[in-house]
């Protein structure tokens, strides 16, 4: 197999080749590095590429395999991470000039766990500034969608999705506060998973709102995400939010099919006036495929979900404004105008609003829990629309554009599950007439990521979307 072909393989395929010693980790890493060198100037997916460190780590991985020591299925597999996650000795910018010289002295827990599993870090990925975009002039280049270089990637884990879609790297980590893993996954045509709150450590994540933040994997398939989640999930003494709930056998859930699975279609999200008709049609087709595949499908109602964005804004945005207040006071012009305005606006939200928003969030959580008592998973569109042209991103000229182009509108269907803390995943479910990807969102019960991954993998197996790649 040629080096160019190696870069196109997913985690599972690479695992088999590496453990059979048919290829070396160094060969795989060199193939990915060559593809990054060729395509990153077009995509701006990577901020930092750690070439020499990656090659050294690959050689160590090869040496261990040669001695009969395997650290698991990720041993020797390349990965990259959103630049909001600490990486020891590698600068971590959080997508901002504010942190362009910050070099952490330790890894984020999720990064450390992937390294401990034998995975090889290639570098750091581009993102919306501070995770709080959109940004008119991103300091490290405009991330571009591999399916159409004039379209947005979504965010804020922009490079995490585009790098997987373009096959620069088979596995990435992102972070999700209101949809920042699932949104770019949907718009770039890959799989992205936000785990249950407390399933994965926050330690070393430069987040926005700790109650809503979560790190998680992005990859070309649900099975690849399952392998990554197994490595990063679990209790962490450095993060009191993490729980002692046992980590499931995620890989074991893959391949179980849809027989006996009960799926609830969220009525309010499917009937949303903000949902573009072509995306609604693709999601409806996905639901039909799930039913034909053996699932039992019914409609469920979550009345308060229509107000989730207001709840989200009232809680998350003041939290972000407080977090970045010192920089707003001392270095405001080192923050792009759009996130700066958004942070300043958020600082004006009265403190009295926040307790009420939290109470409404608890009611929303109860309604989602109630819906999940009757079914195993919920499904909905991931985004209301496909990727928008970069030229119009951030310009708001109508009420519809305010919801479907601005950050709040993009997260209209994803932020409810940051508020409630349920696990949620986006899996590709087809393409629009303009050949732009759309995503199906799958939501599960607390700590039941295995159910979400099972349904996503089963859907992939009965549809052709998993094997589609953009021509970059």
Kindly give the residue locations of the regions a language model identified:
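Structural helix-boundary/capping segments
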Residues: 38, 116, 165-273, 284-293, ...
């Amino acid at each position: 197999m040629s080096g160019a072909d190696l870069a196109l393989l997913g985690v599972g395929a690479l695992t088999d080749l590496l453990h059979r010693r048919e290829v070396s980790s160094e060969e795989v890493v060199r193939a990915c590095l060559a593809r990054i060198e060729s395509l990153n100037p077009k995509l701006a997916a990577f901020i930092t590429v750690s070439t020499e460190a990656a090659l050294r780590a690959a050689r160590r991985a090869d040496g261990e395999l040669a001695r009969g020591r395997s650290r698991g299925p990720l041993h020797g597999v390349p990965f990259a991470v959103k630049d909001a996650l600490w990486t020891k000795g590698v600068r971590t910018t959080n997508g901002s000039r504010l942190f362009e010289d910050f070099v952490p002295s330790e890894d984020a827990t999720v990064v450390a766990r992937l390294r401990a599993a034998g995975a090889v870090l290639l570098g750091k990925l581009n993102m919306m500034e501070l995770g709080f975009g959109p940004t008119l002039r991103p300091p490290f280049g405009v991330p571009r969608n591999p399916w159409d270089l004039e379209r947005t990637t979504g965010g804020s884990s922009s490079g995490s999705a585009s790098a997987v879609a373009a096959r620069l790297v088979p596995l990435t980590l992102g972070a999700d506060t209101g949809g920042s893993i699932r949104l770019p996954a949907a718009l770039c045509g890959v799989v992205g998973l936000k785990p249950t709150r407390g399933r994965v450590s926050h330690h070393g994540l430069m987040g926005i709102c700790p109650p809503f933040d979560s790190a998680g994997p992005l990859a070309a398939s649900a099975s690849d995400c399952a392998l990554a989640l197994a490595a990063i999930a679990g209790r962490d003494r450095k993060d009191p939010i993490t729980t002692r709930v046992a980590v499931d056998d995620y890989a074991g859930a893959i391949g179980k099919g849809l027989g006996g699975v009960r799926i609830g279609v969220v009525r309010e999200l499917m009937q949303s006036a903000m949902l573009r008709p072509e995306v609604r049609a693709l999601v409806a087709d996905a639901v039909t495929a799930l039913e034909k595949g053996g699932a039992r499908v019914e409609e469920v109602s979550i009345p308060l979900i229509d107000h989730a964005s207001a709840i989200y804004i009232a809680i998350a945005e003041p939290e972000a404004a407080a977090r970045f207040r010192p920089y707003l006071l001392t270095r405001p012009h080192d923050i792009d105008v759009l996130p700066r305005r958004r942070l300043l606006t958020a600082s004006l939200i009265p403190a009295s609003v926040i307790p009420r928003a939290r109470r409404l969030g608890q009611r929303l959580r109860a309604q989602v829990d109630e819906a999940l008592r009757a079914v195993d998973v919920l499904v909905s569109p991931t985004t209301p629309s496909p990727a928008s042209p970069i030229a119009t991103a951030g310009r708001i000229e109508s009420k519809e554009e305010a919801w479907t182009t601005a950050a709040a509108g993009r997260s209209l269907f994803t932020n409810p599950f940051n508020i409630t803390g349920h696990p949620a995943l986006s899996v590709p479910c087809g393409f629009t007439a303009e050949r732009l990807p759309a995503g199906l969102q799958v939501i599960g019960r607390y700590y039941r990521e295995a159910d979400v991954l099972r349904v996503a993998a089963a859907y992939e197996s009965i549809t052709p979307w998993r094997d589609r790649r953009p021509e970059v």
